[in-house]
């Protein structure tokens, strides 16, 4: 019988363990591509998990990147900036899909691979019909899990919805919103000028916790997720939920503010900027990301597959069986690539651009986690929700 994460306890019950195979070369050898710590010998060279996954996706998905003549220097801090030069460096240093991928595998599995003939492709392409079915399943699960879809959010933001949200732009309107206009009143919260930033921080946490629980339900509906080790399910959610949250948050934003409480309220960007430090810095980076992400003009079916691929990411630290996760993710990425090709015929580079956005989301989450930890240290009244505290623990 398969193990499952308890419905209302996502992520919390276990701490990811570190694979025993992560010991041989990764402690002292740098990635030949970007200089990060290598996790093993992948595709013919010592490489980190990030560069291994990048090379694997590029080969398997037959990606083509926009040409670059600058011969960009590839380092850990900028390795996601130029995919063309990064792939060229992989090739120039000897990475090959024909090379045996040792990585973090048990010795018995490595011996089997050495003895087996090496094929041109590490896995057969999924039949087109299977990819279409996968797309439909994930899209259906997404729409059944999340009530605030991008279409609904855009209808509200553009005035196509008959009901306008209550606009929160100062202390008075926030107070009205807290009296039941937008949110259910919180009996323990007392809004004063000195506590306004803390209160907004608390509201952000409430929304995050609700979304984490919804993402957990969505993840359990993704084909293949339930077959993973429980440890790996927990690890994937721990590292993936905030990337998914900020991806979906972009749908609720425009340049002037964001929708809250299922579209019942709209908090202005200027009001969020007016909060005292450090709370004024919480949302601004998300607006910057949203402006670029929304320019890609994704719809809900695109987002469903993209969010699923974020969750099923095989290079998360502490996975027991990363190759199993990678196999599931590659099926999802194959479905996403096919779907984008069919629905965005005028955007041939949309798929690699989305892969780049995965890296942008990681950086956004890293910066957010650092800010949250700083608030936790410096603001005695700004308590962190236990679920979020568990997610952030030992993460960055």
Swiss-Prot record:
DNA-binding region: 28-102
Regions of compositional bias (Polar residues) in chain numbering: 15-24
One GO process term, biological-process aspect: positive regulation of transcription by RNA polymerase II
Main location (coarse class): nucleus
Location(s) in or outside the cell: Nucleus
Zn-finger region bounds: NR C4-type: 31-51, 68-90
GO terms of molecular function: DNA-binding transcription repressor activity, RNA polymerase II-specific; nuclear receptor activity; RNA polymerase II cis-regulatory region sequence-specific DNA binding; zinc ion binding
Post-translation changes: 'Lys-48'-linked polyubiquitinated; leading to proteasomal degradation. Deubiquitinated and stabilized by OTUD3.
Region named Disordered: 1-24
Entry-linked Gene3D superfamilies: Erythroid Transcription Factor GATA-1, subunit A, Retinoid X Receptor
Ranges of residues in domain NR LBD: 166-394
Keywords assigned: Activator, DNA-binding, Metal-binding, Nucleus, Receptor, Transcription, Transcription regulation, Ubl conjugation, Zinc, Zinc-finger
Coiled coil: none
GO CC annotations, alphabetized: nucleus
Quaternary assembly: Heterodimer with the retinoid X receptor.
Function: Ligand-activated transcription factor key mediator of energy metabolism in adipose tissues. Receptor that binds peroxisome proliferators such as hypolipidemic drugs and fatty acids. Has a preference for poly-unsaturated fatty acids, such as gamma-linoleic acid and eicosapentanoic acid. Once activated by a ligand, the receptor binds to promoter elements of target genes. Regulates the peroxisomal beta-oxidation pathway of fatty acids. Functions as a transcription activator for the acyl-CoA oxidase gene. Decreases expression of NPC1L1 once activated by a ligand.
Family: Belongs to the nuclear hormone receptor family. NR1 subfamily.
Name assigned to this protein: Peroxisome proliferator-activated receptor delta
The species this protein was found in: Xenopus laevis
């Amino acid at each position: 019988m398969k193990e499952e994460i308890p419905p209302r306890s996502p992520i919390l019950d276990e701490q990811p363990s570190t694979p025993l195979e992560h010991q041989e070369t990764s402690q002292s050898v740098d990635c030949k591509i970007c200089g990060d710590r290598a996790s093993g010998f992948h595709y013919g060279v010592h490489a980190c998990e990030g560069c291994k996954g990048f090379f694997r996706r590029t080969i398997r998905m037959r990606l083509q990147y926009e040409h670059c003549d600058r011969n960009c220097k590839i380092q850990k801090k900028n390795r996601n900036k130029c995919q063309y030069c990064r792939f060229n460096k992989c090739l120039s240093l000897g990475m090959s899909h024909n090379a045996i991928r040792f990585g973090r595998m048990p010795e018995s599995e490595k011996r089997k691979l050495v003895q087996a003939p090496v094929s041109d492709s590490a896995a057969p392409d999924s039949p087109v019909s299977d990819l279409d079915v996968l797309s439909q399943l994930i899209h259906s699960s997404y729409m059944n899990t999340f009530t605030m879809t991008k279409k609904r959010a855009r209808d509200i933001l553009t005035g196509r919805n008959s009901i306008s949200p209550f606009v929160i732009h100062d202390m008075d309107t926030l107070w009205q919103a807290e009296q039941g206009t937008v949110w259910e009143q919180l009996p323990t919260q007392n809004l004063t000028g000195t506590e306004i930033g803390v209160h907004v921080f608390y509201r952000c946490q409430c929304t995050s916790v609700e979304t984490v629980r919804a993402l957990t339900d969505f993840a359990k509906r993704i084909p293949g997720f339930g077959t993973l080790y429980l440890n790996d399910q927990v690890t994937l959610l721990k590292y993936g939920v905030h990337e998914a949250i900020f991806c979906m948050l972009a749908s609720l934003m425009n340049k002037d503010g964001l929708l809250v409480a299922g579209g019942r309220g709209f908090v202005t960007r200027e009001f969020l900027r007016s909060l005292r430090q450090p709370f004024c810095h919480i949302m601004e980076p998300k607006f910057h990301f949203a402006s670029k992400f929304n320019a890609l003009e994704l719809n809900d079916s695109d987002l469903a597959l993209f969010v699923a691929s974020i969750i099923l990411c095989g290079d998360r630290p502490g996975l027991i069986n990363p190759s199993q996760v990678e196999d599931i993710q590659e099926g999802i990425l194959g479905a996403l690539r096919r779907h984008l090709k069919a629905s965005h015929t005028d955007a041939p580079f949309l798929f690699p651009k989305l892969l780049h956005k995965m890296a942008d989301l990681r950086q956004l989450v890293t910066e957010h986690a650092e800010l949250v930890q700083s608030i936790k240290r410096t603001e005695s009244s700004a308590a962190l929700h236990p679920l979020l505290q568990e997610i952030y623990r030992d993460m960055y």
